[in-house]
Regions:
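N-terminal mature ectodomain segment of secretory-pathway/periplasmic proteins
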Residues: 1-73, 98-147
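Short, solvent-exposed recognition patches
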Residues: 24, 32-34, 183-288, 298
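Residue-level signal for well-ordered, solvent-exposed loop/turn and beta-edge residues enriched
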Residues: 74, 113, 138-140, 152, ...
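Extended beta-strand-rich segments in extracellular/periplasmic secretory proteins, especially
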Residues: 90-147, 179-187, 191-232
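A generic structural motif
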Residues: 49, 72, 121, 147-148, ...
Length: 310
């Protein structure tokens, strides 16, 4: 059932309305969008809420996304990250099943449809990490809930309505003409050979010597953050992810809109932010600036941080 759910968008075409809720310790966010998806890999999201996104849309064509910003009259073009493809391919599915137990909860109904409920529990911690509501007939995930390490609901994404149909015109997935095209964040060609990426970073980069049980390398690349050449290393256990960013400058990742708390990484000053299931931890040592971003508890990120430069 789980593998069927992962593969469902590759052969199902549909339209619908989706609501997403992200629950953070400092703020919560909600969004509503219409979606048109044409199998195997064309989709478009039309945002209805919040007001700041109303009228904007995102077109996905294979691995390329076009974010249409109507207020700025521009289209931001970017390549999908591996983070967006977690458990979407067979190798990631193998990682997931080696780290999580999938069990059935009592069936439910959605808009007259029978729904199978699958609960994913981490084999090492015993914690429930994800809960999926899957259309029993088509295999499509109709609702997804993600839980933080403390057991609190961190994210909920669900269809408010859905219609399966192949009558979706290809013109919906065409990028509007006349708008300015802008390249998204600059990133190098990603590689799953992380040691090679570290060696080619252009500065004395480091990788973690410790990872929580079940986490494996996914990919690494060099990105441009605030004009600073930054090495990005990504690890995953099939559901949760952790990213290590490092550079010669002081380009923080994602701290701008949050109030950070001070802490220590071994003998170095550090700061962290908790936002729902995601934790950010930043520190500097040996002339480098590091930021860890992961769906892990602070104690786990601190262990990873301490292992980067033992």
């Amino acid at each position: 059932m789980l593998h069927t759910a992962i593969e469902a968008p590759h052969h199902l075409s549909y339209t619908g309305e989706i609501q997403t809720l992200n629950f953070g310790s400092q703020k919560s966010e909600a969004a509503i969008y219409r979606i048109e998806h044409r199998a195997p890999n064309l989709s478009r999201r039309w945002y209805l809420a919040p007001q700041s996104l109303y009228g904007d849309s995102v077109i996905s064509r294979g691995e390329t996304t076009y974010s249409i910003d109507v207020k700025r009259d521009r289209v931001v073009v970017a390549q999908d990250d591996a983070i967006d493809d977690q458990v979407a391919e067979d190798d990631n599915f193998a990682v997931l099943t080696s780290n999580y137990n999938a069990t059935f909860a009592p069936d439910e109904t959605f808009d007259g449809r029978n729904v199978r409920v699958v609960v994913l529990t981490n084999k090492f911690t015993g914690e429930m990490t994800m809960r999926l509501h899957i259309d029993a007939q088509t295999g499509l995930v109709l609702e997804k809930q993600i839980y933080a390490a403390n057991g609190a609901l961190a994210m909920q994404e669900r269809f408010e309505d859905i219609h399966y149909t192949a009558a979706i015109p290809t013109g919906l997935f065409e990028v509007p003409k006349g708008m300015k095209l802008v390249n998204g964040p600059s990133r190098g060609l990603p590689s799953n050979d992380l040691q090679h990426v570290i060696a080619a970073a252009g500065f004395p980069a480091h990788g973690p010597k410790y990872l929580p049980e079940g986490f494996e390398p996914v990919e690494g690349d060099v990105v441009d953050i605030k004009g600073v050449r930054t090495l990005h290393l990504l690890y995953s256990d099939g559901i949760r992810t952790v990213s290590l960013f490092q550079n010669h400058g002081n380009a923080d990742v994602g701290f701008e809109n949050y109030k950070a708390t001070t802490t220590r990484v071994e003998n170095h000053d550090a700061k962290y932010v908790e936002d729902g299931s995601t934790m950010l931890l930043a520190w500097s040592e040996s002339g480098l600036h590091f930021t860890l971003v992961g769906e892990l508890a602070l104690s786990e990120l601190e262990k990873i941080a301490a292992s980067v430069i033992p």
